[in-house]
Regions:
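Short beta-strand His + acidic residue motifs that chelate non-heme Fe in jelly-roll/DSBH
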Residues: 103-105, 129-131, 148-149, 153-160
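Non-heme Fe(II)/2-oxoglutarate
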Residues: 1-84
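Charged, low-complexity interaction regions
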Residues: 210-219
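Short, conserved beta-strand element in jelly-roll/cupin
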Residues: 95, 112-128
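A short hydrophobic beta-strand segment most commonly corresponding to one strand
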Residues: 117-122, 145-147, 161-179
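A short beta-strand-loop-beta hairpin characteristic of the jelly-roll/cupin
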Residues: 103, 122-142
């Protein structure tokens, strides 16, 4: 069985991460749409989204993503993205406010075995942030680069008086990433076939896309409704 989480053999400069975060602080950070999953303050801005809007923080698989205007100002974030030699989907900054909690939940089809991997790069964090995946604490430090299988139960609690902010990059598995993950001790021989969306999942995707009207999102909705 593959690890529930693993640190990647790459680290990034904390001072550069925090400098670029400062460029993003003036943006309107959008509250996470699933209010039942957290208590306190959980917000985000997008560097790459389905509509190209900074405020579009939804993340669904097998949908085209484009860079936002914010990414064009964030050269170091783009350099980090380019390190991953694979297709990227949603790229976001996720902020968990002081004394806030993301309740335990699962995100479907977000394991490496499903052909997907989500990367976390902590920009602001501290010892009072408790990140658990499959009941095991993941000790992420600023500048480190981590993968976790978010199809497993996971939760985060920020018990500090400071925000916790991560850069997250959603990636599509390929030969390059297989070599990387094999070096990290993963069995890369397994690969799940792409799944068809259930009616309920389609409706959820359509609902979230409808919250950010755009020509691109309208096309995605039409394609989903036609299937």
């Amino acid at each position: 069985m593959n690890p529930s989480s693993s640190i990647l053999p790459i680290a990034f400069l904390v001072n550069k991460l925090q400098q670029e975060l400062a460029l993003c602080e003036s943006e309107l950070w959008t509250p996470h749409f699933n209010t039942g999953r957290y208590e306190g303050n959980w917000t985000s801005v997008s560097l790459r989204s389905q509509s190209g809007l900074v405020s579009d923080i939804t993340s669904f698989p097998n949908i085209e993503y484009i860079n936002t205007s914010l990414l064009e100002r964030c050269y170091y974030f783009k350099e980090i993205m380019d390190w991953f030699q694979c297709e990227k989907e949603a790229v976001r900054l996720l902020r968990l406010g002081p004394n806030s909690e993301i309740k335990e939940h699962v995100d479907n089809d977000t394991s490496y075995e499903d052909g997907f991997f989500r990367i976390h790069v902590p920009i602001l964090t501290n010892s009072e942030v408790f990140f658990y995946v499959d009941k095991k604490r993941v000790p992420m430090k600023m500048g480190e680069c981590w993968y976790a299988n978010f199809q497993l139960p996971h939760s985060v609690e920020n018990k500090s008086g400071e925000p916790r902010i991560h850069l997250t990059i959603d990636c599509i598995r390929n030969e390059w990433s297989d070599k990387l993950f094999a070096q990290m001790g993963f069995d890369t021989s397994s690969f799940s076939n792409q799944k068809e969306y259930s009616h309920e999942v389609k409706q959820l995707i359509i609902e979230e896309l409808s919250r950010n009207p755009s020509e691109i999102n309208a096309k995605i909705i039409a394609d989903l409704q036609a299937k």
